[in-house]
C-alpha cells in the first residue's frame, strides 16, 4: 500500500558510543628526510702538542707529540619528537621548499624513535573534523576504508587495500571542536597498499522515516599509541588531535592487510577549527604502491560542496627525499575517536527510467542497482563555479590524481641529505586508506572555487532500471600508470539521445489530487516548464527527535513520473563546520638516508694560523760532528834554554828527545758544521684555537631541489558544498517515451491526499562529481528535512542526493491520469548525507521539486580538479627546526682544507745552545813526516801557537851519573851587608 506519512520526529537517541577506532591507515610514503640539524659547535682545539726536541744540528728533532684531538663538537640536540597529534585531514602537498643552503653538517642527532602504533580504536561516531593538516608529502592514497577514528598516529603503515565501504551510520550532531594541538611529527609515509576490492553494494534497506539527528557522540579520548596490532576494522575518523611538531620520521612499518571496513559511525558535528600545529619536517617518502586495477566505477556521486579552505601550512623544510620505505604493517588503530563521518553511500545502480509523474500513486519498488560501470578516470577539473547550495552529499568518487607538488618554498638549511628515495610511480589513487600520519603540511592551498558544474549532458530518458547487478568486485589495483588525461567515462547503459530540454512551463497550481487512476502507460513527456526561481531556503526546521525508522512500505507498483516540476529553491549552502582538530602526527620515522651531498660551499677563509708552538725540547745531542780539521801543527817550540850545566859531573846525556810536544791546541774549532738538516718540524703544535670560523661562505648554490616528492594524493579537501549543479540545460526533448499506455481513466479527482511519502525515487542520473571522488559513503539516514514547505515550484532538478544504494523502491504509485500533476508529494528524502567531512550541516533542503525527468546523465564530467591549488597561503611560521636528524653517516671526509697559509716563519728558534763541542775528533793520524826538506830559511817566528797543552812529560832520561860531590868552590861572593847591631851586652 502507499507508504504512510512519516511519523513525528523521534527523540534524539543518546549519543552513540564512540565506535572502535579504525586501524591506522598504512603509512604514507616516507616524507623527505628532515633537514640536517645545524652543525654542532666546533670542539675546542686540542692543547698544543709539544714541540719536538730540537735535534742537534743535523739530527732531525723528534716530532713533538701530537696534541690530542679536540673533543668532538657537541652533538646537536636532537629535536624532540613532537607529540603526535591526531591526524588531520590530509593536507595538500606542501610546496617543496627550495633547497636551503647547506649548513655545516652537525653531528648526527639520535634518530627519533618511531612511536608505537596506536591501538586500534573502535569506530566511533565521527568526530569533529580537525583542521586540515598541513599536507605532508602525500602518500599515495590507499583505497578508502571506512574512516576509523584516527588514533594517535603511529608511524603510518602502508596503505592497505581498501575494504568495501560500510554502511553509513546515523549522522551525529555536531560536536564541539577540540583545540587543535600542535602538529605531531610526521611519520614516514608508507607505501601505498593495494586497494582491496570494494564490497558489493548492499541491498538497500527499506526506507524508513529518517531518524532525527542523534546527539553527537562523545568524543573518544585519544589513547596512547599501542603497539602495532593486527589491523582491526577501520573505525570512524576521530577528531584530529592537536598537531604536534613533526618529529623525525619513524621507520616505515610493514603494511598490514586492510581490515574490512567497519560501519560508518554517525557523523559528528563539525567542531571549531583548532589552531594549526607547527609543521614538522617531512618524513622520507615511501615508495608508491602498485597501481591497482581499475575497480568498477561506481556511479558518479553528486559533487559535494567545496571544503573550506585550509590554512596554509608553513613551508616545511624540504628534506631530501628519503629512501623508499618498505611497506609497514599497519599500526593498531588508536583509541576510539569521536563519531565518524557518515558512511559512504554504496554504489549507485543505474538509474531507472523516470516515469512520467502522475499523481503520485503508491510508490513502486526501485529497480535493483545494476553493476557499476567501469570507472571513468577522473577528468580534469572544470573551472570552478560558484558554490551551489549544498546538495546532499553525493557518492564519493575516487580520489583524483595526485596534485603536483607546489612550488618549492624557501629551503631550510640543507641537512645532510639522504639519497633521494625512488619516486614510485604514482598509483592510481585508491580510496584513501585510514589516514597515515600526516606529513608535514605544505601550506594548504586555498580551496579553488568549485567549478561550475558542467551542464549535465542531456539526459535521455533513462531506461528502466535493470535489476541491480551485483557490484563487481574491483579488480586488484594495477600499478598506477601516470594519470593520463581522463579517459572517457566508462560506457553507461545506452541512453537515448537526449532531446533538447523544452522550456519548462511554470508549474500550474496543483489541482486537487485525483484518485489514482490505473497506472497508465508512460505518456509522452511534456516539455519542461521554465525553471521557477529558486525559492529561498527556509529556515531549518527544528530538528525533531529521531523517530524510529519506519518500515519500508512494500513497494507498490511504480507510478509514472509526472513532469518535472520547477526546481525548488536551492538550499543555502551549509556553513562549513569548524575544522576538527588535527590528529597527532605519528612519531618521527627514522631519518631518511642522507640525501645527496649538497655542493660544498666554498671553503671558508683559512682560519688564522694557530699560535706558534712552544719551542720543542732540546733534542739529544747528535753524534759528534765531524772533527774539525786538525789545526796546523804548532810551530816548533823555541828550543828551551839550555839547562845550566849540572853540577859538574859529567853532563848526563840529554835524554832522548821527548816525544813530540803535544799537538798544538786544536786549531780553532772548525766552524760548526752547517747545522744538520733541520729536524723535521715536529708536528705542528696543536692548532691554535680555530680562528673564528670563517663566515660560512655564501651558501653554495642550493642543490637543485630534489625532484618534488611524488605528489601526494591530492588531499581530499573536504568536499566543499557541491557546486550548484549547473542549471540543468533544458531537458532534451524526451527520448521517445516508452509507449504510453492509454491513460487509465481518470478517477474522479479526490481531494488531494496528503502526499504519501514519495517512494524512493528511481536513482538519479549520476552527476559527475567535480571533486575527487572518494568512495561514496552510504548516505546516512537523512535528517528530517525541515518541515516541508509547500513545494516550491518544482525547480530544475536539484542535485541528486547521493545515490544510496537504491532503497527498495516503494511501490510505484499507480500512475494517475496524467493530468496536471497533483501536488507533488514531497520527494522521498534521499537520506541526507551524514555530514561529510567538514561539511556544515546541510540546511534543510527546500523540498526538492519533484525531480525532473532525469536527463541521461551526461558523460561524467571530468573530475573537477582538486580545486586549483589555492595560492599558497603565506607561509606559516617555519616549523621549529626538526630535531636534528640522526647523524648521517659521516660524510666523506671533506677535502682537506687548503693548507692554511704557512704561518710566518717563526723566528728562528734560538739556536740551541751550542752543545758543548764534541770531544775533539781524534787527531788525524799524523801522516808520516815527509822527508824533511832542506830547511828553508827560518821564517819569522810563527805566531805563537796557542800554547799547547803541556805535552805529556817526556820520559825522564836516565839520570846521569852523579856529578862529583864537590864542586869547585865558587868565587867568593861579595860581602853581605852588615847585619843589624846586636843587642847590647849585659852590664
From Swiss-Prot:
GO terms for molecular function: extracellular matrix structural constituent conferring tensile strength. The keyword Oxidoreductase does not apply. Residues 756-765 have a biased composition (Gly residues). The keyword Phosphoprotein applies. InterPro entries: Collagen, Collagen_superfamily. It is found in: Secreted; Secreted, Extracellular space; Secreted, Extracellular space, Extracellular matrix. Keywords: Calcium, Collagen, Extracellular matrix, Hydroxylation, Phosphoprotein, Repeat, Secreted. GO terms for cellular component: collagen trimer; extracellular matrix; extracellular space. Type I collagen is a member of group I collagen (fibrillar forming collagen). This is Collagen alpha-1(I) chain. It comes from Orycteropus afer (Aardvark). The lineage of its organism: Eukaryota, Metazoa, Chordata, Craniata, Vertebrata. The gene is COL1A1.
Amino acid at each position: 500500500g502507499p507508504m504512510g506519512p512519516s511519523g513525528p520526529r523521534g527523540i534524539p537517541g543518546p549519543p552513540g558510543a564512540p565506535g572502535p577506532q579504525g586501524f591506522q591507515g598504512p603509512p604514507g610514503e616516507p616524507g623527505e628526510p628532515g633537514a640536517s640539524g645545524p652543525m654542532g659547535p666546533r670542539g675546542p682545539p686540542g692543547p698544543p702538542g709539544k714541540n719536538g726536541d730540537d735535534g742537534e744540528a743535523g739530527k732531525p728533532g723528534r716530532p713533538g707529540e701530537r696534541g690530542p684531538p679536540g673533543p668532538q663538537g657537541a652533538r646537536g640536540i636532537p629535536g624532540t619528537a613532537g607529540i603526535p597529534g591526531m591526524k588531520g585531514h590530509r593536507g595538500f602537498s606542501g610546496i617543496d621548499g627550495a633547497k636551503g643552503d647547506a649548513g655545516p653538517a652537525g653531528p648526527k642527532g639520535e634518530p627519533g624513535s618511531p612511536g608505537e602504533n596506536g591501538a586500534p580504536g573502535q569506530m566511533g561516531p565521527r568526530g569533529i573534523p580537525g583542521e586540515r593538516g598541513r599536507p605532508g608529502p602525500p602518500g599515495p592514497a590507499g583505497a578508502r576504508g571506512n574512516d576509523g577514528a584516527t588514533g594517535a598516529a603511529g608511524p603510518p603503515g602502508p596503505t592497505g587495500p581498501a575494504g568495501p565501504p560500510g554502511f553509513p551510520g546515523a549522522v551525529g550532531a555536531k560536536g564541539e571542536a577540540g583545540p587543535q594541538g600542535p602538529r605531531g611529527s610526521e611519520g614516514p609515509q608508507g607505501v601505498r597498499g593495494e586497494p582491496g576490492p570494494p564490497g558489493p553494494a548492499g541491498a538497500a534497506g527499506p526506507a524508513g522515516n529518517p531518524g532525527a539527528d542523534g546527539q553527537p557522540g562523545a568524543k573518544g579520548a585519544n589513547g596512547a599509541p599501542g603497539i602495532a596490532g593486527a589491523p582491526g576494522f577501520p573505525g570512524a575518523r576521530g577528531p584530529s588531535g592537536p598537531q604536534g611538531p613533526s618529529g623525525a620520521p619513524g621507520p616505515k612499518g610493514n603494511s598490514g592487510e586492510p581490515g574490512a571496513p567497519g560501519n560508518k559511525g554517525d557523523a559528528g558535528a563539525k567542531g571549531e577549527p583548532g589552531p594549526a600545529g607547527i609543521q614538522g619536517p617531512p618524513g622520507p617518502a615511501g615508495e608508491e604502491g602498485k597501481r591497482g586495477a581499475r575497480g568498477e566505477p561506481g556511479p558518479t556521486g553528486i559533487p559535494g560542496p567545496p571544503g573550506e579552505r585550509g590554512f596554509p601550512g608553513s613551508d616545511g623544510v624540504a628534506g631530501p627525499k628519503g629512501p623508499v620505505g618498505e611497506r609497514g604493517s599497519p599500526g593498531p588503530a588508536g583509541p576510539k575517536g569521536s563519531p565518524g563521518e557518515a558512511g559512504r553511500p554504496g554504489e549507485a545502480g543505474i538509474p531507472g527510467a523516470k516515469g512520467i509523474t502522475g499523481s503520485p500513486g503508491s510508490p513502486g519498488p526501485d529497480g535493483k542497482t545494476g553493476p557499476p560501470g567501469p570507472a571513468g578516470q577522473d577528468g580534469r577539473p572544470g573551472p570552478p563555479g560558484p558554490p551551489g547550495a549544498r546538495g546532499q552529499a553525493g557518492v564519493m568518487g575516487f580520489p583524483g590524481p595526485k596534485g603536483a607538488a607546489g612550488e618549492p618554498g624557501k629551503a631550510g638549511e640543507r641537512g645532510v641529505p639522504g639519497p633521494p628515495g625512488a619516486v614510485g610511480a604514482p598509483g592510481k589513487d585508491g580510496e584513501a586508506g585510514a589516514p597515515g600520519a600526516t606529513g608535514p603540511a605544505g601550506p594548504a592551498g586555498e580551496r579553488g572555487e568549485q567549478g561550475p558544474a558542467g551542464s549535465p549532458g542531456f539526459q535521455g530518458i533513462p531506461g528502466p532500471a535493470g535489476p541491480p547487478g551485483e557490484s563487481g568486485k574491483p579488480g586488484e589495483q594495477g600499478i598506477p600508470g601516470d594519470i593520463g588525461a581522463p579517459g572517457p567515462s566508462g560506457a553507461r547503459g545506452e541512453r537515448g539521445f537526449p532531446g533538447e530540454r523544452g522550456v519548462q512551463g511554470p508549474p500550474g497550481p496543483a489541482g486537487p489530487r485525483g484518485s489514482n487512476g490505473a497506472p497508465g502507460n508512460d505518456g509522452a513527456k511534456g516539455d519542461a516548464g521554465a525553471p521557477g526561481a529558486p525559492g529561498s531556503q527556509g529556515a531549518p526546521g527544528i530538528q525533531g527527535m529521531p523517530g524510529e525508522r519506519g518500515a519500508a512500505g512494500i513497494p507498490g507498483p511504480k507510478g509514472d513520473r509526472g513532469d518535472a516540476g520547477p526546481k525548488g529553491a536551492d538550499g543555502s549552502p551549509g556553513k562549513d563546520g569548524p575544522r576538527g582538530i588535527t590528529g597527532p602526527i605519528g612519531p618521527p620515522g627514522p631519518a631518511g638516508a642522507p640525501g645527496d651531498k649538497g655542493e660544498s660551499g666554498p671553503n671558508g677563509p683559512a682560519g688564522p694560523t694557530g699560535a706558534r708552538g712552544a719551542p720543542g725540547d732540546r733534542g739529544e745531542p747528535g753524534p759528534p760532528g765531524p772533527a774539525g780539521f786538525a789545526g796546523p801543527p804548532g810551530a816548533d817550540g823555541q828550543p828551551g834554554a839550555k839547562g845550566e850545566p849540572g853540577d859538574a859531573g859529567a853532563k848526563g846525556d840529554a835524554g832522548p828527545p821527548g816525544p813530540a810536544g803535544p799537538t798544538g791546541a786544536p786549531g780553532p774549532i772548525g766552524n760548526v758544521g752547517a747545522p744538520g738538516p733541520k729536524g723535521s718540524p715536529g708536528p705542528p703544535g696543536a692548532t691554535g684555537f680555530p680562528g673564528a670560523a670563517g663566515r660560512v661562505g655564501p651558501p653554495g648554490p642550493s642543490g637543485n631541489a630534489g625532484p618534488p616528492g611524488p605528489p601526494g594524493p591530492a588531499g581530499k579537501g573536504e568536499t566543499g558544498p557541491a557546486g550548484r549543479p549547473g542549471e540543468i540545460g533544458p531537458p532534451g526533448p524526451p527520448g521517445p517515451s516508452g509507449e504510453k499506455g492509454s491513460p487509465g481513466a481518470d478517477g474522479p479527482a479526490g481531494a488531494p491526499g496528503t502526499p504519501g511519502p514519495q517512494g524512493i525515487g528511481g536513482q538519479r542520473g549520476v552527476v559527475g562529481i567535480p571533486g575527487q571522488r572518494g568512495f561514496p559513503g552510504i548516505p546516512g539516514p537523512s535528517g528530517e528535512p525541515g518541515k516541508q514547505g509547500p513545494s516550491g515550484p518544482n525547480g530544475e532538478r536539484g542535485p541528486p542526493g547521493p545515490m544510496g544504494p537504491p532503497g527498495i523502491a516503494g511501490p510505484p504509485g499507480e500512475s494517475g491520469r496524467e493530468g496536471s500533476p497533483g501536488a507533488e508529494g514531497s520527494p522521498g528524502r534521499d537520506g541526507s548525507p551524514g555530514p561529510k567531512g567538514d561539511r556544515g550541516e546541510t540546511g534543510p533542503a527546500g523540498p526538492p521539486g519533484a525531480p525532473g525527468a532525469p536527463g541521461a546523465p551526461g558523460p561524467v564530467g571530468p573530475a573537477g580538479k582538486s580545486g586549483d591549488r589555492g595560492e599558497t597561503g603565506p607561509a606559516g611560521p617555519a616549523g621549529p627546526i626538526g630535531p636534528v636528524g640522526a647523524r648521517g653517516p659521516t660524510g666523506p671526509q671533506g677535502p682537506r682544507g687548503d693548507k692554511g697559509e704557512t704561518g710566518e716563519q717563526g723566528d728562528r728558534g734560538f739556536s740551541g745552545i751550542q752543545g758543548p763541542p764534541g770531544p775533539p775528533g781524534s787527531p788525524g793520524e799524523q801522516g808520516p813526516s815527509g822527508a824533511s826538506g832542506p830547511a828553508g830559511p827560518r821564517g819569522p817566528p810563527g805566531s805563537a801557537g796557542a800554547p799547547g797543552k803541556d805535552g805529556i812529560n817526556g820520559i825522564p832520561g836516565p839520570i846521569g851519573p852523579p856529578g862529583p860531590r864537590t864542586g869547585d868552590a865558587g868565587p867568593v861572593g861579595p860581602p853581605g851587608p852588615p847585619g843589624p847591631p846586636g843587642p847590647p851586652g849585659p852590664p
